[in-house]
Amino acid sequence: MTKISKIIDELNNQQADAAWITTPLNVYYFTGYRSEPHERLFALLIKKDGKQVLFCPKMEVEEVKASPFTGEIVGYLDTENPFSLYPQTINKLLIESEHLTVARQKQLISGFNVNSFGDVDLTIKQLRNIKSEDEISKIRKAAELADKCIEIGVSYLKEGVTEREVVNHIEQTIKQYGVNEMSFDTMVLFGDHAASPHGTPGDRRLKSNEYVLFDLGVIYEHYCSDMTRTIKFGEPSKEAQEIYNIVLEAETSAIQAIKPGIPLKDIDHIARNIISEKGYGEYFPHRLGHGLGLQEHEYQDVSSTNSNLLEAGMVITIEPGIYVPSVAGVRIEDDILVTNEGYEVLTHYEK
């Protein structure tokens, strides 16, 4: 069943006439055309009969025509009201309720004479949750490039270098491999600074005998990777190395349990129980992982409260961590494809 067919099914389920999609990544997912319109209207209308209409600034029309999108295009000037160019009466409209602003909703009421709204967010999340072979190949390449980033960063480590210098070196060097954009702000944290799970790289200088935490990802043809490695520089303290071994055991055990039909919360419990049994439960303050695709964090989450089941075609992260102030912060993260038989680890830098 195609993506559009799934939306039409949801329109029928909710007795709605059309769906209105405005999140740029979701529009790209359905059309193959990517735009960042800022304040301008950029939206895809999917009607119950399968017709698709893309609203975009007139200056982008030729780009849309060159894209895979084959539906109708409504291009508008900045001085025009887009709705006046495509007059419609839509009794019930499905929207991305988590994203659509009140101002845009008012425009829809007046522009399309909408009487009521429904939600299409969950349907889109469920579609994006299961990756196609093409999407998987792009994520696999993004993961390969993330491995390269770690390699670049580790090779640059030397006593006295700052966190910020290592970040800059990684992001400049990886451009030689065709990477134009990182998935998120690259994180490099030294020693006990890594005890802040989302710390900001700064001017802290690397000292002998401490761990270095790398958390990074790249975007390849719109798809993200996201991986973390914690690397020894010299011989860290006995407690820091003990923490590392516990995190590695938790991650390995959780990954080995992945297969279709297993509740996501069970995977979280496996890692969390190992860390708790070793006395560090209070120092693992976040969920075990999350979905990965067009965004570095997307549906679904790997958490203790998510009873949904793993399915073949999902790509998730597994990233346990222990963060002890004044001692060390250790996190290890891999990107995992759920396969029919079990799993495939997409990130490969040594641990």
UniProtKB/Swiss-Prot annotation:
CDD domains: APP-like. Its EC number is 3.4.-.-. GO terms for molecular function: hydrolase activity; metal ion binding. InterPro entries: Creatin/AminoP/Spt16_N, Creatinase/aminopeptidase-like, Creatinase_N, Pept_M24, Peptidase_M24B, Peptidase_M24B_aminopep-P_CS. Signal peptide: none annotated. It comes from the Bacteria. Binds 2 manganese ions per subunit. Mn(2+) 1 binds at D226, H290, E319, E333. Pfam families: Creatinase_N, Peptidase_M24. PROSITE patterns: PROLINE_PEPTIDASE. Its cofactor is Mn(2+). Keywords: Hydrolase, Manganese, Metal-binding. Gene3D superfamilies: Creatinase/methionine aminopeptidase superfamily, Creatinase/prolidase N-terminal domain. SUPFAM superfamilies: Creatinase/aminopeptidase, Creatinase/prolidase N-terminal domain. Mn(2+) 2 binds at D215, D226, E333. PANTHER family: AMINOPEPTIDASE, DIPEPTIDASE YKVY-RELATED. Belongs to the peptidase M24B family. This is Uncharacterized peptidase MW1651.
